[in-house]
Amino acid sequence: MEITNVMEYEKIAKEKLPKMVYDYYASGAEDQWTLQENRNAFSRILFRPRILIDVSKIDVSTTVLGFNISMPIMIAPTAMQKMAHPDGELATARATSAAGTIMTLSSWATCSVEEVASTGPGIRFFQLYVYKDRNVVIQLVKRAEEAGFKAIALTVDTPRLGRRESDIKNRFALPRGLTLKNFEGLDLGKIDKTNDSGLASYVAGQVDQSLSWKDIKWLQSITSLPILVKGVITAEDARIAVEYGAAGIIVSNHGARQLDYVPATIVALEEVVKAVEGRIPVFLDGGVRRGTDVFKALALGASGVFVGRPSLFSLAADGEAGVRKMLQMLRDEFELTMALSGCRSLREISRTHIKTDWDTPHYLSAKL
């Protein structure tokens, strides 16, 4: 069967993967309202395309933190990719490098930073949680630096693990034979097989619930790598992130896996962009499944997007080739959207190219 869009990979992955694994990747917190809303909110944003513009040449390339990449579509950190495919993060790394874009490696990966680096050249970021034992954090960051990773994506929306009910029902645990490779030798590689998500006790015991803004300064003191703050969805926190020297912000609700009933990231994006006032770049993850979604995010001020579940499902369906094709499809759709909207480069994508349901007060539109 010819795969024609990114969503089709999820159907294949659901058929191929054990229920426990598919549910772990696919589910969100509690009622999963935000999980649905991350997608639905994109569908409420409409285009205002401009016509009769020469779009015979289109450039989708961009720069992120000074690094040249082929397109504003990057790979978000997702945990334990060997549950999806035996090659796990190595396949994702190779596919991302081939596409000329950035991969963010989860610190809860089933391949180590060194193994991922060994796949060849590529621009890679390292996702980090801060643990009570700061020595663990120092070791992880140093290893990422030495392996040539270019930035730290600090996850800040997880003082505790969200309640994912399918994981509780399935008694989720890391399948036998897989380990969290970055923690080998740190006495943290084993997950307690409790009756919750299996990760909850691990996170509760190790992730530092007292994490605060001052810890960003501490992190800057142990690394020269730029720090992206991942998990900002309000203007207030965006301003503080700038004050504390964040190199960038990732507007993220953790794939709707943490606090349910937070806004879709595409809805929260513009508030954050306006608060930042162009001082640092703002990125988005959550719900991106089409090239049209990428365009909408950029029109609302994002410098680029990260995709998470599409990489997992394409990996499960067809390994490295699946991830390559997924990225190529998103790129092709995005380029087509640019052409049909009258944009030849990312610079030309503007707020005037879209209409959102918060643009015009409803009472006003009712009068027109």
Curated annotation (Swiss-Prot):
> EC number(s)?
1.1.3.15
The listed locations are: Peroxisome
What gene is behind this protein?
Answer: GLO5
Q: What is this protein called?
A: Glycolate oxidase 3
The family database entries (Pfam families) matched by this protein are listed as: FMN_dh
- Annotated FMN binding lies at 77-79, 106, 127-129, 155, 230, 252, 285-289, 308-309
Could you state one GO biological process linked to this protein? hydrogen peroxide biosynthetic process
Q: Which family does it belong to?
A: Belongs to the FMN-dependent alpha-hydroxy acid dehydrogenase family.
| Role played | Catalyzes the oxidation of glycolate to glyoxylate, with a reduction of O2 to H2O2. Is a key enzyme in photorespiration in green plants.
Positions of the record's site feature: Involved in determining the substrate specificity of glycolate oxidase? 108
